[in-house]
Amino acid sequence: MRVLLAPMEGVLDALVRELLTEVNDYDLCITEFVRVVDQLLPVKVFHRICPELHHASRTPSGTPVRIQLLGQHPQWLAENAARATALGSYGVDLNCGCPSKVVNGSGGGATLLKDPELIYQGAKAMRAAVPSHLPVTVKVRLGWDSGDRKFEIADAVQQAGASELVVHGRTKAQGYRAEHIDWQAIGEIRQRLTIPVIANGEILDWQSAQACMATSGCDAVMIGRGALNIPNLSRVVKYNEPRMPWPEVVTLLQKYTRLEKQGDTGLYHVARIKQWLGYLRKEYIEATELFQSIRALNRSSEIARAIQAIKI
């Protein structure tokens, strides 16, 4: 089976990709989105989102990285897709699933689910602009406020010439509510298409991964939030390994505080470590205790000292 690390805006940046791919067995990472509006973006934008471009589009441990674009105008999606791959990205992905109100308000992400023709035009333009040996992929949800158009959306992706499709098993309106996950609908899409379909949503451990694959028939999954709850989740999902012990999680957090974020104003680790602990608290009681001990700290140096001082 293949396990992909999902794009999570504001969460899974290059530093976290470096940490997670070092202790996992991911087949591919997708970057946070590059927002495309009405221009060909400067090279520095791609390097900021995906510094792995300087290293053959791979993380330090060797996992391939693919740039994701977010936008609605086929011409500019195409030009920026061409630039991304010319810079070395291992293919390019189109975001048609982000449920953020800000993103949707500007006509991007899940808003495209309302107009499958626009998905078709965007993906087709990207496919034409990218060398044929490189993948052009698309990530969608089941629909905007219902799944009534899921086949129309999936057909648009395949007819555009996309290499594969990632389907998050909820509509935009359903957000991330666990009770709404619909792996069966992903399976219906998989049966309809001839291109590979990758299942996404509520894959949080070995059992849920097995259930998802059995229900959907997919042999590849993409994991997002769960990868932060359990830092070695790809190995749990692939090999039924136990979750990472807390002392190893601490070691990972300690390494995180030592990594330098380019352009950091001093607040990067403050926000990101507190955010990560919020995910870890779902699996590790010790993370709750650590969060309480640092929640009042507002300087990176203070948080780094507190985490480095943990005895493991």
UniProtKB/Swiss-Prot annotation:
InterPro entries: Aldolase_TIM, DUS-like_FMN-bd, DUS_fam, DusC, DusC_C, tRNA_hU_synthase_CS. The gene is dusC. GO terms for molecular function: flavin adenine dinucleotide binding; FMN binding; tRNA binding; tRNA-dihydrouridine16 synthase activity. The active site is at C98 (proton donor). FMN binds at P7, M8, E9, Q68, K139, N200, G201, E202, G224, R225. Belongs to the Dus family. DusC subfamily. This is tRNA-dihydrouridine(16) synthase. The keyword Lyase does not apply. HAMAP family: DusC_subfam. The lineage of its organism: Bacteria, Pseudomonadati, Pseudomonadota, Gammaproteobacteria, Enterobacterales. Keywords: Flavoprotein, FMN, NADP, Oxidoreductase, RNA-binding, tRNA processing, tRNA-binding. It catalyses: 5,6-dihydrouridine(16) in tRNA + NADP(+) = uridine(16) in tRNA + NADPH + H(+); 5,6-dihydrouridine(16) in tRNA + NAD(+) = uridine(16) in tRNA + NADH + H(+). NCBIfam families: PRK10550.1.
